[in-house]
């Protein structure tokens, strides 16, 4: 018997294979990485619209009297700033200030909060909440109860309108609707930096919604897009990916996610540690790197000033939009590195020149 855990298969795998997708493991799931090619899918999303199957994302439900109050006492962001029909980016931390996961919390009612964590961390988030929950609250892992389909790009509203789905929500708002008898939660969220939506139909009915979206996306000049393009798109925005820019060893402050912490709240997981880190100043900070010459950055490369190592890359890719190599790196705060400064990255023993920049690398168009 193999000790390697079997990969989880999404509800739309057969459709992806018919579309010619290539697949890879991500977060324990077998997911489509590309169809026509990552660059083509990336550019289609920036200029028209891309359709992503991100059903590997987690889903969980906190339900019972005072569910919102409990979630607000556990996760970092201030849930009291939103209400029903709104969603919020937030983090689930350890008591030492590390990040178990970053996730989206959907405020359904005072007694019901729907969560979308990352694929590999869903069980850990559910477990942390269950361990702290008072009696009368249920925290349920619904990972394979819903699919998640992302429609991203400047033509995304046209696509949803063609299906008769709601589009009028503000950024981070959501509405419950239906398509052809299938209930769908439609959210004004995304991970690309473009105007877009994420749709959550039931797992078993996802194909009906996907087929209709694909036809409308094609009519709008777009194409299906895989996780390869999703990664290049999020890297251009400087968005963190758990396991790269956030982890049990990388705090929200180090990843420049302090804006997602409700510092005035009385309680959240890791509050004391994060307040202490905020007072002292984080020892390292996430920065952007833009290559001066040719090449591609990858995670885990040393960032150098002269012969001194001052940081490490966390993500890197070729930017189809800018036609240059870009990356993200954690750089020591006491190194005194300023935006615009030239540094080097050790790429296979060769010092490659990069410019330190403040992400995003391209303009944000989410709103």
Swiss-Prot record:
<dbReference type="InterPro" id="IPR029043">
    <property type="entry name" value="GcvT/YgfZ_C"/>
</dbReference>
<keyword id="KW-0808">Transferase</keyword>
<dbReference type="GO" id="GO:0008483">
    <property type="term" value="F:transaminase activity"/>
</dbReference>
<dbReference type="GO" id="GO:0004047">
    <property type="term" value="F:aminomethyltransferase activity"/>
</dbReference>
<dbReference type="InterPro" id="IPR006223">
    <property type="entry name" value="GCS_T"/>
</dbReference>
<dbReference type="Pfam" id="PF01571">
    <property type="entry name" value="GCV_T"/>
</dbReference>
<dbReference type="InterPro" id="IPR013977">
    <property type="entry name" value="GCST_C"/>
</dbReference>
<dbReference type="InterPro" id="IPR028896">
    <property type="entry name" value="GcvT/YgfZ/DmdA"/>
</dbReference>
<comment type="function">
    <text>The glycine cleavage system catalyzes the degradation of glycine.</text>
</comment>
<comment type="subunit">
    <text>The glycine cleavage system is composed of four proteins: P, T, L and H.</text>
</comment>
<dbReference type="InterPro" id="IPR027266">
    <property type="entry name" value="TrmE/GcvT_dom1"/>
</dbReference>
<dbReference type="InterPro" id="IPR006222">
    <property type="entry name" value="GCV_T_N"/>
</dbReference>
<dbReference type="GO" id="GO:0005829">
    <property type="term" value="C:cytosol"/>
</dbReference>
<dbReference type="GO" id="GO:0019464">
    <property type="term" value="P:glycine decarboxylation via glycine cleavage system"/>
</dbReference>
<dbReference type="InterPro" id="IPR022903">
    <property type="entry name" value="GCS_T_bac"/>
</dbReference>
<dbReference type="GO" id="GO:0009274">
    <property type="term" value="C:peptidoglycan-based cell wall"/>
</dbReference>
<keyword id="KW-0032">Aminotransferase</keyword>
<dbReference type="GO" id="GO:0005960">
    <property type="term" value="C:glycine cleavage complex"/>
</dbReference>
<comment type="similarity">
    <text>Belongs to the GcvT family.</text>
</comment>
<dbReference type="Pfam" id="PF08669">
    <property type="entry name" value="GCV_T_C"/>
</dbReference>
<protein>
    <recommendedName>
        <fullName>Aminomethyltransferase</fullName>
        <ecNumber>2.1.2.10</ecNumber>
    </recommendedName>
</protein>
């Amino acid at each position: 018997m193999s000790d390697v855990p079997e990969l989880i298969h999404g509800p739309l795998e057969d459709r992806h294979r018919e579309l010619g997708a290539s697949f890879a493991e991500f977060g324990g799931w077998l997911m489509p990485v590309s169809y026509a090619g990552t660059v083509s899918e990336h550019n289609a999303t920036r200029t028209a619209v891309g359709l992503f199957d991100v059903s590997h994302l987690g889903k969980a439900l906190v339900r019972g009297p005072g569910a919102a109050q409990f979630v607000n006492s556990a996760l970092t962001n201030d849930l009291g700033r939103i209400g029903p029909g709104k969603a919020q980016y937030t983090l689930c931390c350890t008591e030492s200030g590390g990040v178990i996961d970053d996730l989206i919390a959907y405020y359904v009612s005072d007694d019901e909060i729907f969560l979308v964590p990352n694929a590999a961390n869903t069980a850990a988030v559910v477990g942390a909440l269950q361990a702290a929950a008072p009696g009368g609250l249920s925290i349920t892992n619904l990972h394979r109860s819903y699919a998640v389909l992302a429609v991203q790009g400047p033509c995304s509203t046209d696509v949803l309108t063609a299906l008769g789905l709601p589009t009028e929500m503000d950024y981070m708002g959501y509405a419950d609707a239906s398509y052809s008898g299938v209930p769908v939660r439609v959210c004004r969220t995304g991970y690309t930096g473009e105007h877009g939506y994420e749709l959550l139909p039931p797992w078993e009915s996802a194909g009906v919604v996907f087929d209709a979206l694909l036809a409308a996306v094609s009519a709008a000049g777009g194409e299906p897009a895989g996780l390869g393009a999703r990664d290049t798109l999020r890297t251009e925005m400087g968005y963190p990916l758990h396991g790269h820019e956030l982890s049990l060893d990388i705090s929200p402050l180090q990843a420049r996610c302090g804006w997602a912490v409700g510092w005035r709240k009385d309680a959240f997981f890791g509050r004391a540690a994060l307040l202490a880190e905020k007072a002292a100043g984080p020892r390292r900070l996430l920065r952007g790197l833009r290559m001066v010459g040719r090449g591609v950055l990858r995670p885990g490369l040393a960032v150098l000033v002269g012969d001194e190592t001052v940081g490490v890359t966390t993500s890197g890719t070729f930017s189809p939009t800018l036609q240059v190599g870009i990356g993200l790196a954690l750089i020591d705060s006491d190194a005194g590195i300023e935006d615009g400064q030239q540094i080097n990255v050790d790429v296979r023993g060769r010092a490659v020149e990069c410019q330190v920049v403040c992400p995003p690398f391209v303009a944000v168009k989410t709103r």
